[in-house]
């Protein structure tokens, strides 16, 4: 049963009495009746002290305690109109809903629904395990959507955007070189097949250039270059010259590869 627009409804005047009657029918006919609490316009909040009908904890509490709906038969259906789809879905879990409705990458009406990939990592953080889920599939799905459906993720989208683990600050890149955990949310290479990257610009510094070379060429750790490398220093001079001439955009991979090739020949080295 879809309880549409529940965050603007009369919870104790209609919703709870209605669900009580549904539970009676379930007991009489021995057929499970699933209750889907739909935050149709995204008005739900998880703030302590918030009152119904907007309180997500209050709604779930009312369904379980006063309507007698078993936890395993409660689902939360969220919308992202106020950027609360993920928070409210997680809150519904914590207060007794066993299911959360999701869509891949949050694609849905208006501002979208709860992203499936977000709830995968919410689950992992709550439970301390992925329970066998292969999260690298998230990256494969994003690539499929882009190549086959023409759907390009906004670059800053967590887990799937092109820039979600890319740093442009030289000091951050220096930290990545020394210890990836400092400036990467988790082992994105392991869990998403997306190692952290840096964009090379006038703010990247020597460390940023070194990290780009190590990442782009997939160099084994024993062959990593660092900010003391002659190659890195030579590339840095070239990068600085680009911006002194008025450039305002980050350097592309192809530009860097071409210049690195030239510098390697001049230095008589190979990567």
Regions found by a protein language model. Give the residues of each.
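Glycine-rich phosphate-binding active-site loops on the catalytic face of alpha/beta enzymes
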Residues: 94-115
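C-terminal helical cap(s) of enzyme catalytic domains, especially alpha/beta-barrels
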Residues: 108-135
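Hydrophobic faces of well-ordered beta-strands that scaffold small-molecule active sites
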Residues: 1-3, 33-37, 72-78, 100-102, ...
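A mid-to-C-terminal "edge-of-domain" accessory segment
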Residues: 128-271
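Short, acidic/polar
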Residues: 84-90
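Alpha/beta enzyme core
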Residues: 2-70, 90, 94-95
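Active-site-proximal loop/turn and secondary-structure-junction residues that shape catalytic pockets
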Residues: 3-7, 39-43, 78-84, 104-108
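Predominant activation on well-ordered alpha-helical scaffold segments within soluble catalytic domains
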Residues: 16-20, 57-64, 90-94, 116-124, ...
């Amino acid at each position: 049963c879809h309880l549409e627009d529940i965050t603007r409804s009369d919870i104790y005047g209609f919703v709870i009495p209605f669900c009580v009657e549904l539970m009676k029918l379930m007991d009489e006919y021995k057929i499970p009746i699933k209750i889907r609490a739909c935050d149709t316009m995204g008005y739900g909040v998880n703030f302590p002290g918030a009152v119904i009908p907007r309180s997500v904890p209050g709604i779930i509490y009312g369904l379980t305690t006063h309507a007698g709906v078993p936890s395993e038969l409660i689902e939360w259906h969220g919308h992202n109109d106020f950027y609360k789809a993920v928070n409210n879905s997680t809150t519904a879990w914590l207060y007794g809903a066993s299911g959360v409705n999701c869509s891949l990458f949050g694609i849905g009406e208006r501002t979208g629904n709860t992203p499936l990939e977000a709830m995968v990592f919410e689950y992992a953080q709550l439970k301390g395990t992925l329970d066998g889920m292969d999260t690298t599939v998230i990256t494969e799905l994003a690539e499929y959507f882009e190549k086959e459906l023409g759907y390009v993720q906004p670059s800053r989208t967590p887990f799937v955007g092109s820039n979600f683990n890319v740093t442009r600050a030289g000091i951050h890149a220096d930290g990545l070189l020394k210890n990836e955990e400092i400036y990467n949310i988790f082992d994105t290479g392991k869990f998403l097949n997306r190692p952290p990257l840096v964009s090379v610009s006038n703010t990247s510094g020597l460390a940023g250039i070194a990290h780009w070379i190590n990442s782009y060429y997939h160099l084994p750790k024993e062959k990593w270059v660092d900010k003391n490398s002659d190659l890195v220093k030579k590339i840095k001079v070239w990068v600085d010259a680009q911006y002194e001439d008025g450039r305002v955009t980050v350097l592309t991979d192809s530009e860097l590869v071409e210049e690195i090739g030239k510098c390697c020949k001049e230095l008589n080295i190979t990567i």
